């Protein structure tokens, strides 16, 4: 079983012997772990000697009316799952341990990259992500950290944060893990009713179809995205966004599309109580 620490000072003492000759990996999570999280741990073990998994439902990244209070807390089950994949340490701090003052007087503002996509409807979300990830980096001082590519914008922001703040940490983006029907695994999938769960894979099917159309580059992006938006909406989703970006999350249009080898199509959509995220990388077929 992994060793559980609840206090910053205890975790630092536990990790001190490894810092000289061994590599430490961090896998930050909010708990309620599924196979996607466990895959992050497996990847971390391939790149490091010691794997630390943080489990902390971070209040600073939730907005008013979001699901902070109802977000599942399943620490005992999570630790049992982490034991099966060989995690070494679990860091499960309280809110008071992480934030002596809440909201914290110090903030991390990641700039314009946060103002698009999820940032449009969750305006303070990535500020909260920035502060908690920075704190975890300072507490654990890992050599590597592993994040899932499902949260594509978050991954891009964390890479920027590491670069801008000169952290000596290698960031690994892990591929999206999907259910057998293609739905991207997410802790919030459990909010789906039985009928909604049957509908949910349509989201990735539409992404896959649209990615192929973008790759072939045979019709304007606006036409393609409008048609996809209509199909997704008619299936019962409420779309937050459906956009095509460069892999660095800069804007792209029909005039500039051939300047890029790779793009990404990203979607966030509500289905009942569940806000689902997904994305697909797109390689442009050059004529």
UniProtKB/Swiss-Prot annotation:
The reaction proceeds by a bi uni uni bi ping pong mechanism. Homodimer. This is Pantothenate synthetase. NCBIfam families: cyt_tran_rel (TIGR00125), panC (TIGR00018). GO terms for molecular function: ATP binding; pantoate-beta-alanine ligase activity. Pfam families: Pantoate_ligase. Keywords: ATP-binding, Cytoplasm, Ligase, Nucleotide-binding, Pantothenate biosynthesis. It comes from the Bacteria. The active site is at 37 (proton donor). GO terms for biological process: pantothenate biosynthetic process. GO terms for cellular component: cytosol. (R)-pantoate binds at residues 61, 154. The keyword Nucleotide-binding applies.
